[in-house]
Amino acid sequence: MWNKHRLAFILVGLLFHLFYLRSIFDIYFVSPLVHGMRQFKSNEEPPAKRLFLIVGDGLRADTSFDKVKHPVTGKTEFLAPYLRSLVEHNATYGISHTRMPTESRPGHVAMIAGFYEDVSAVTKGWKENPVDFDSVFNQSTHTYSFGSPDILPMFKSGASDPTKVDAWMYGHEFEDFTQSSIELDAYVFRHMDALFRNATVDSKLRHEMMQDGNVFFLHLLGCDTAGHSYRPYSAEYYDNVKYIDSQLERLVPKVREFFGDDDTAFVFTADHGMSAFGSHGDGHPNNTRTPLVAWGAGLNRPVLNDVPVYDNYTENWDLAHVRRNDVNQADIASLMSYLIGLNYPTNSVGELPLAYVNGTERTKLNALYKNALSILEQYLVKETEMIQSQLVYKEYPKFAQKSHSSYIQEIEHLIDRIANGEEDLEPEAIALSEELMKTALEGLQYLTTYNWRFIRSIVTLGFIGWITYSFTIFLRLFILEKQYAMKTSPQNLASFGALTAALNYVLYYQRSPFNYYMYLLFPLFFWSQILTNSTILHDGIREMFKGVSMLQRIGICALIVSIYEGIVYGYFDRWIFTIIFNLLALYPFFCGIKDAKTNMFWGANSMALSIFTLFDAVKIESLTQINVSGLLLVASGLYALWRVSKKINSHTKIVILLQILLLAMMLAVTNKSVTSLQQRAGLPTDAKIAGWVILTLSLSLMPLLHYLKPSNDYQVRVLVIYLTFAPTFLILTISFESFFYLLFTNYLMLWIEIESKIKAQNIAKNSQNWLQLLRISIIGFFLLQFAFFGTGNVASISSFSLDSVYRLMPVFDPFPMGALLILKIMIPYILLSTALGIMNLKLNIKDYTVSSLILSTSDVLSLNFFYLLRTEGSWLDIGVTISNYCLAILSSLFMIVLELFSHFLLKNVRDNGMDIAASKQQKRH
């Protein structure tokens, strides 16, 4: 029953969790991006007139230079002989080290804008989403870009003058994972050739193309597409690399012929690599190491090593005699700016890689100094903003010891002395410029985190206040019988009023955003209410733990905290869930269940489920596992139908048989799709259509047919729900997930029966045991986490395999593909929702008791993850901590959603002749 107290409680909880969900992005992940900086030109006498940037999307560094055995021809060869010849004779080469996430948008932003998008960019997509900061394209005279519609628009739309960036893009339908990826790259080279041809008959176009400072950007998506579809060790991936190399060999002389000079600079690199599983996104070296080969005007020729340099990673490259010059990905933007004399992008944090520059030491020094001034300017603008918004400002300690003006004076003094002939001072000036850049970047981070301590303290008090306040409300609504009329004392009002005014003034002076005021409002409200309702808290705890000694209370609390902390660690190491499951295998015995058969089945199921969190979260497609699990799903459906056949009418029996038939048909369709895709024959049209038809029928028509003549038995309803989602789960299975689906459903049914037996024992003893409610809530919350982590983790989603998705959607489209992934993730939650609803029915638990108790305790997880958030390290690690926090803070709210959804799923369901409506009348009010 909903009353005003419950509604107020839910509303406050909803607002609190939504605002505090946002808090991490306002605290930890505020963008260091600043605007209004002066611009610094990299080079007054640029060595190149134009620049070609060629990006092999998804190209690994080792594949570019390794001698590999072709899986089809059996021939051992270098895949890119032309690039190798450049490395050995004409170019400077190295590895470009990317940051995480190793995705297309952040990779291109880093190399073209010189800026690593802050972690708040994880909330952004990449399609049609313009970059909101300066870039090499923005500074260029004109940019001609060719390639993917996922990359080109964000730089064209984000340019200060979109007309200066031209884009030739293929349609999204070209990105078909089952077709030849070479066609994507062929489109780029064809249109580059067409541009040259058109310029021979269009004088205006030719004039524009002949201008100094132009950039030609060739985005080659083929390797990424082939890697996703067939893995980076496939013939398709290797052939795509060979195709790119052959086209580069044709392109370079065409460029020389068209422009009639050798004043073109070429930069070849990649945005990210590719894992052995055909995915990217995380911090694995195969994803973060990309090739960088730069040749042409203004660029050094190769430097030979006096002594060959060998290491395990490059031993098959046969390039030990050539010096390798590694860079950070953002450094490429500074290099490109220097080559054609552009202003450094105003938000760039890249450092000019001097090893690539062919110029005098004085030229290099001046360019590097301007690079340092460009980065320092970002710090100075940010510092000015900070000084104007702080009651007391403390300067960055390193600049307090040695001011930025002192750095500038020293460097300029050294430059003057070098100009007067003291060239031996050049290394010192370069080192000082690099030190200034490093200190300015550290100072920028210091300013970004300046107010952390204050606002984190507020959020911490908010979480602790919510846990205490919500538990008090739970006790009042569900445990205590009598009504309390509590009023806030004048002293309470006065003290909290004064504190509110003082803290809000601090926020106002700091020009804090609106959200900060809300972060402050919640702890002030919670702690005021806690002091007012302290009597309820005291009486409620005494009632809930009636008959339980103080030592036992401490033990129960310690156990609950241990389980929650175990769940926290399980977010990072899934094997913790294995331990918890094996401990849960013993709980029926300790709760007094003497039935050996029940204990044996429960223990066996617990241990079987515990194995899943030991499997690798990143799965490899296995048709054998899909077939075995699919047959078990069909067999389990037939067995369950036999068990309930005496309870159901002929209509229900026919519909269930149809559901089982659809499941068997989906298994056949999945087999055909997987086999065809593995044989590189594409996705058969009939299999694609059949997959969508079966999925639609199982999720829509079958439930409607049941609704015409519904069975109200809870076991039948569970079977119907189980078979409704089984075909969808099966076609989206990569390997072992359908085993999980079967065992998880069985586990939930066993849990219901065990708790029903424990309830019967309590009734026989004529005792009201609130500890059963506490136990159900804790186990239910654990299963809520396991429903997600049983088949994967956050990292496996961030770089999820497309194997299952392109059985239904062979053409790349991230949003529908993401929707299918979310549907697969949600299905175990629907099963859990059903189980909790039946538990409420069988145990006569008042509606929303379980979810309210979880809501009041589960933010122990949220508080943990708030302090476990990372802002440094790999983007995978950072992204995982963000996702963990979001999962934790939303999971308690999700329990309410599950309980609400269970009312819909279990409408009119009966247990032993008693329907929900009748059951509710017997519940305590």
Curated annotation (Swiss-Prot):
Leading EC class: transferase
Subcellular location as annotated: Endoplasmic reticulum membrane
Record topology, Cytoplasmic segments: 1-6, 479-492, 538-547, 596-599, 643-653, 709-719, 797-818, 870-885
Taxonomy of the source species: Eukaryota, Fungi, Dikarya, Ascomycota, Saccharomycotina
Enzyme Commission identifier(s): 2.-.-.-
A biological-process GO annotation: ATP transport
Family from the record: Belongs to the PIGG/PIGN/PIGO family. PIGN subfamily.
Pfam families, sorted: PigN, Sulfatase
Positions in the Lumenal compartment: 28-457, 511-516, 569-574, 621, 675-687, 741-775, 840-848, 907-925
Biological role stated in the UniProt entry: Ethanolamine phosphate transferase involved in glycosylphosphatidylinositol-anchor biosynthesis. Transfers ethanolamine phosphate to the first alpha-1,4-linked mannose of the glycosylphosphatidylinositol precursor of GPI-anchor.
Transit peptide listed as a keyword: no
Gene Ontology molecular function, alphabetical: mannose-ethanolamine phosphotransferase activity
Protein origin, superkingdom: Eukaryota
GO cellular component terms, A-Z: endoplasmic reticulum membrane; fungal-type cell wall; fungal-type vacuole
The species this protein was found in: Eremothecium gossypii (strain ATCC 10895 / CBS 109.51 / FGSC 9923 / NRRL Y-1056)
Its membrane topology: Multi-pass membrane protein
Keywords: Cell wall biogenesis/degradation, Endoplasmic reticulum, Glycoprotein, GPI-anchor biosynthesis, Membrane, Transferase, Transmembrane, Transmembrane helix
The protein's name in its UniProt record: GPI ethanolamine phosphate transferase 1
Residue intervals passing through the bilayer: 7-27, 458-478, 493-510, 517-537, 548-568, 575-595, 600-620, 622-642, 654-674, 688-708, 720-740, 776-796, 819-839, 849-869, 886-906
Glycosylated residues, chain numbering: 90, 138, 198, 286, 312, 358
Leader sequence residues: none
